[in-house]
C-alpha cells in the first residue's frame, strides 16, 4: 500500500487462522506464508487475531516469535520486571496481539488487556508514540456465536475505548464477525444510507449456522426469510466507533470467503468482516484503505489483511 505522505502511519488488522495450533510440516509452511504476508505489507502497526496457545506463557512466547520473524516489536515497558508482550488472552484459546515497527515507542504502563469476563475472545490495546503523536491502537476478535452477545460485547467495547472523555485517539483492528451497519450521506438525496448496502446472505440457501449472523421471520406460507443482522454493527457506529472503509467511501472489498474449505465461506460467500474502526478524532486523519488480496495472502489465511493509512498531524482532540 503506497503512502500518501512519508509521515503517515499504516495500521493493519490480520486474522492469522489458528496460528501455532499445530506443529506439523503443512502448518509450519503456512506460518512462513503468514510471516511473508506481514513482511510484504510493510505496515507500521499490526493487530493480529487467532494466536493459538494453551496458556499465557506459551502465548507470549509465540507472539514474540511472530514479532521477531516479521521484523517487528511487541513488548511494553513496565516499571518493574521484564517488558510485557502486548497480548490479551482469550478464554477459548484464541488470543489477540499487537506488533509495531522499530521507531514507534509504546508508552510505559499503557498496555490494557481484556479477556475472560469481558469478551468471548479478547481485546488488547497499547498507547503508541507515532512520531510525536500519542495514539492508542487495539486488536480485537468478536464472538463468532451469539448475535445478542455480540451486540452486548460491542457495547462494552465502545465503552472501553471511547471513555472517559478525553481519551487518546484510538484505532481498533478486528475480526468483527458481523456485517457493517455504518451509514454515509448520499450526496444526491442528503439521506443517510448504508455504506454496505448489499446483504452478504441474500440469495444464500438457509443453513442452521446462519442463526449466528442473521435475523429471520416467516411469510404467509410459512417460508423462512432471512437477512443479515445489523444490530451488532449498528452498536459500533451509533456508539462512535466508525468503520474506516465507510468513512473514506472506499470501494467495497470482501475480506473473508476465499477459502473453499471453510464452512463459513459456503454459508455467506464473500463477506467483509475484518476492518479497522476509529474514534471521532481519527476520522479527519484517515487517508487511505486497502485490502491485501494477493495469491500469497489467500494461501496464508482464510482472512485477508486490511490496512488503513492515517496522518498523525491531522488527528483532532476531543
Each language-model region and where it sits:
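Metal-dependent phosphoesterases centered on the DNase I-like endonuclease/exonuclease/phosphatase
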Residues: 155-269, 273, 280
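Active-site beta-strand/loop signature of hydrolases that rely on acidic residues for catalysis
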Residues: 10-16, 34-59, 126, 137-138, ...
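Structured beta-strand-rich core segments of catalytic domains in phosphoester-bond hydrolases
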Residues: 27, 51-138
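Active-site environment of divalent metal-dependent phosphoester hydrolases
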Residues: 19, 53-58, 82-85, 92-93, ...
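Acidic/histidine-rich helix-loop elements
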Residues: 13-30, 145-146
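Conserved beta strand-loop-helix elements of the APE1-like EEP
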Residues: 88-107, 235-240, 263-284, 310-311
